[in-house]
């Protein structure tokens, strides 16, 4: 993938990791040429094919968390992360018919940053298979209290005060006879309509509901989270150089592409694609037909727009 993006000019060999690592484009071209000759295609065709295959796999993963769960991707904004996320976000959004995307600040190290900032959490589950109509509110409370007691004891070993722990309750439910469950949030004021919430969730996920079939409780679930004070840290702010332009070759065409540092983009300034937006921990390939702005949170907001053919 890196070789393919490098050969297509979407990654600058001299700007990888903010210039801290130089990529060998000649070796990348040689590797692609070897395979391209066996497949009887050009180097650029192979590079585009590699990226297309990879993006199709990414689309499958996005389908699994959207369409397959009853959500229309077009109703959402695509958020990407990772060093290569910005290289593919425009194409992925187009494949999902999405009109906007967000590349968070420090997106290239977002996972690592998230691990450092994430709140400590414990998940507890107790299996208790019974028809929902046959268990009382008092019995559910007893089950949750048992899990909360167990969880609190574990968290106290980390010297956490009870007042800093947030509790979230939920139930794994299914229609009687099913082998899979849906997790439904639970609170005291939901005890009378929990079955209705399950029917609605089943409708959203699978397109139908079985209101005449008994709803069965399978698991009682508890999530305990240690509340911690969050801060807005800035990881990478160094500007490498001013905006420049260069001509990069895409399959069968040449386009003048703006190359600039993300940190040099002013809040509210509009960048029109095609453009390459560089930063120390990632690269963004802004395709033709897309524009980008930095918002008040220093996130890069991408929007799809109509291309005027001259």
Predicted regions and their residues:
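C-terminal, non-catalytic interaction/recognition modules in large multi-subunit enzymes and RNPs
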Residues: 1-73, 80, 85-310
């Amino acid at each position: 993938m890196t070789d393919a993006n490098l050969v297509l000019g979407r990654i600058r060999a001299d700007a990888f990791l903010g210039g801290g690592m130089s990529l060998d484009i000649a070796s990348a071209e040689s590797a692609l040429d070897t395979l391209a000759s066996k497949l009887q295609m050009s180097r650029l065709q192979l590079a585009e094919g590699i990226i297309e295959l990879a993006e199709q796999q990414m689309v499958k993963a996005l389908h699994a968390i959207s369409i397959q769960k009853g959500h229309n991707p077009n109703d959402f904004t695509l958020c990407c992360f990772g060093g290569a996320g910005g290289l593919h976000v425009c194409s992925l959004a187009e494949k999902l018919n999405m009109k906007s995307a967000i590349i968070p600040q420090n997106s290239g190290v977002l996972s690592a940053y998230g691990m450092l900032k994430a709140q400590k959490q414990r998940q507890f589950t107790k299996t208790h298979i019974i028809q929902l109509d046959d268990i009382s509110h008092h019995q559910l409370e007893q089950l949750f209290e048992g899990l909360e007691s167990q969880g609190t004891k574990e968290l106290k070993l980390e010297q956490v005060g009870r007042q800093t722990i947030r509790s979230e309750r939920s139930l794994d439910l299914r229609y009687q006879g099913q082998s899979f469950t849906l997790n439904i949030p639970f609170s005291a004021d939901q005890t009378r309509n929990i079955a209705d919430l399950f029917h609605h969730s089943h409708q959203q996920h699978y397109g139908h509901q079985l209101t005449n079939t008994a709803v069965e409780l399978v698991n009682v679930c508890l999530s305990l989270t240690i509340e911690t004070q969050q801060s807005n840290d800035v990881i990478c702010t160094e500007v490498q150089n001013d905006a420049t332009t260069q001509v990069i070759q895409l399959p069968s065409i040449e386009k003048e592409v703006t190359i600039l540092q993300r940190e040099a983009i002013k809040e509210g300034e509009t960048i029109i694609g095609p453009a390459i937006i560089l930063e120390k921990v990632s690269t963004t390939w802004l395709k033709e037909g897309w524009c980008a702005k930095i918002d008040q949170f220093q996130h890069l907001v991408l929007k799809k727009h109509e291309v005027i053919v001259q």
